[in-house]
Amino acid sequence: MDDGSTISPKASVEGFLNKLNVRLLGQLHSGPAAARNYGARHAIGNFLAFTDDDCAPSPSWLQTLAAGFDSFPDCALGGRTINGVPNNLYSTTSQLVIDYLYTHYNPNRQRATFLTSNNLALPAERFHALGGFDAAWKCAAGEDRELCDRWVSHGYRMVYVPEAVVEHFHTLTWRTFFRQHFNYGRGAFYFRRAFARRRQGPIRLERPSFYLAAIRYPFSQRQANKALAVAALIIGAQVASAAGFFWERANEIDAE
């Protein structure tokens, strides 16, 4: 699915035309949520599997997800994503934040509540019945969290399948790292607002212990010298995310 990219993926796809039943679809740039929905509408089959253009699924990725659907045919399945550029500290930190979120939100793998869209598979019928991703989200920042919450709030289950591995090659600089987390904060505002409206309550943030645990998390995963640098970047990411959240909130207040 080509969401209005400046470099056409046509040449990459052509090498598989004689090997796989594959189609290249395209649209004017509308954001990842709209692009996934567009691709899903043209997909054939009972299940949909999503990944991103900077990801490399393992050779057994689809087979592993298919085996998961044998056991959980009505559930959304999400696999494990690993950092494909381990020598990049910013990319390492960004993936470690996701790893922490999986640890926090998915203590029971068969009752997961958060799965990222770069390693996600769902029953097509239920995906379409829910309306797919919310296409109002124009940037890659929280649209998967919103879909997961909508899925669970309808009584559907999500299952974490760590054997379904995708490698993520997202090279970051200090500038793109902080921009990414600023956008995550923007997305978090809309997610929290949707979460609150769905439950007819006020917008609530996580408790302080959630953010403190995120800062401590690298020390349980890495050598102390590298963990300190990662923890410092996580603090910076939290500041950037908070800035994005309150920036988006202020814009909404001004619009009112």
Residue ranges and their predicted role:
Residues S60-S91:
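Conserved donor NDP-sugar-binding/catalytic core segment of glycosyltransferases
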Residues N83, T103-E125, K138-G142, E146:
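A recurrent flexible, glycine/aromatic-enriched loop bordering the glycosyltransferase active site
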Residues Q27-A43:
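Glycine-rich, basic loop-to-helix element that forms the pyrophosphate-binding segment
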Residues L48:
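Short aromatic/hydrophobic "clamp" motif used to bind/position activated sugar donors
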Residues M1-G26:
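Acidic donor-binding segment of Leloir-type glycosyltransferases
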Residues A56, T113, H128-Y160, A164-E167:
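Donor nucleotide-sugar recognition loop
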Residues N21, L25-P32, A56:
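Short, acidic/glycine-rich phosphate-metal binding loop used to engage nucleotide
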Residues M158-A243:
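Active-site-adjacent helix/loop segment of glycosyltransferases
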